[in-house]
Amino acid sequence: MGDIRKVVFEENKLEKKLCRLVGQAIGDFGMIEDGDKVMVCVSGGKDSYAMLDILMKLRERAPIDFEIVAVNLDQKQPNFPAETLPNYLRSLGIPFHIEEQDTYSIVKRVIPEGKTTCGLCSRLRRGILYRVADELGATKIALGHHRDDILETLMLNMFYAGKLKGMPPKLRSDDGKHIVIRPLAYVPEKLLERYAIDMNFPIIPCDLCGSQPNLQRQVMKEMLRDWEKKHPGRVENLFRSMHHIVPSHLMDGEAFDFKNLEISTELSGIAARSSGDRAIDEADLDELACGTMIQGTYNPSL
């Protein structure tokens, strides 16, 4: 009995942590508002299953009212288990919609054999999901990208595209008609892997299309996992850095007006240097009396 209680305790602990992280992301970025109808995109993978499950749990205790409708896009891939998701969603007792669109044939016709089809497939899928959201009257579209997806995208853009660009937790579509949210933005993938096992989700393999894996993304994934093992805290700090941007210390002239930067006589002391390179003189000492200086950084929390 002791072992069983321990297992149940650990499962509840994981569920609470996921609820906390998802709830925090929703609150931080204003993802869901009172009266929203959230279209939860469910692919049959561990991430979207967990997202749906956690959103359902949060809806029960949230101080606001919002609807959930689960949507799956059946892209007519060979050997796709067409009844798996309908049966599962039906068992949950929630509204759901299965959209059948043969994008598989389109992608196979356009992309050469042996090449990854993920890019074109995702763009086709996005257009269909936007249309379905309109038809269902959904005000938000929830996707199951997690923290690791966001970091991998950041690194991919830096290494292969020369851009400091990630994957936003909330965005407006190019046509301005849809709001896409990523409630799992704060959730590490390893927690979702554990949760999928605990919940025994009916996972549908993601390689049914026969596409080659995105090797560049796989390299980023392995690199981040290697960092996590060898340098604890590095990945978390990398993710944290996305929350603390200092445009004046980068090189994007559109994000910061370097050309018109001039000496200012209106700012003084620590306030004048809040964006980065801080110097200390005698006049600053009173302001620092209650704080701690470490390597030139004023950290009042220490």
UniProtKB/Swiss-Prot annotation:
GO terms for molecular function: 4 iron, 4 sulfur cluster binding; ATP binding; magnesium ion binding; sulfurtransferase activity; tRNA binding. Binds 1 [4Fe-4S] cluster per subunit. The cluster is chelated by three Cys residues, the fourth Fe has a free coordination site that may bind a sulfur atom transferred from the persulfide of IscS. GO terms for cellular component: cytoplasm. Signal peptide: none annotated. Its EC number is 2.8.1.-. It comes from the Bacteria. [4Fe-4S] cluster binds at residues 118, 121, 209. Keywords: 4Fe-4S, ATP-binding, Cytoplasm, Iron, Iron-sulfur, Magnesium, Metal-binding, Nucleotide-binding, RNA-binding, Transferase, tRNA processing, tRNA-binding. It catalyses: cytidine(32) in tRNA + S-sulfanyl-L-cysteinyl-[cysteine desulfurase] + AH2 + ATP = 2-thiocytidine(32) in tRNA + L-cysteinyl-[cysteine desulfurase] + A + AMP + diphosphate + H(+). SUPFAM superfamilies: Adenine nucleotide alpha hydrolases-like. It is an enzyme of class 2 (transferase). InterPro entries: Rossmann-like_a/b/a_fold (IPR014729), TilS/TtcA_N (IPR011063), tRNA_Cyd_32_2_STrfase (IPR012089), tRNA_thiolation_TtcA_Ctu1 (IPR035107). One of its GO terms (biological process) is tRNA thio-modification. Its cofactor is Mg(2+); [4Fe-4S] cluster. A motif (PP-loop motif) lies at residues 43-48. Pathway: tRNA modification. It is found in: Cytoplasm. Catalyzes the ATP-dependent 2-thiolation of cytidine in position 32 of tRNA, to form 2-thiocytidine (s(2)C32). The sulfur atoms are provided by the cysteine/cysteine desulfurase (IscS) system. NCBIfam families: PRK10696.1 (NF007972). Homodimer. Belongs to the TtcA family. The thiolation reaction likely consists of two steps: a first activation step by ATP to form an adenylated intermediate of the target base of tRNA, and a second nucleophilic substitution step of the sulfur (S) atom supplied by the hydrosulfide attached to the Fe-S cluster. This is tRNA-cytidine(32) 2-sulfurtransferase. It comes from Polynucleobacter asymbioticus (strain DSM 18221 / CIP 109841 / QLW-P1DMWA-1).
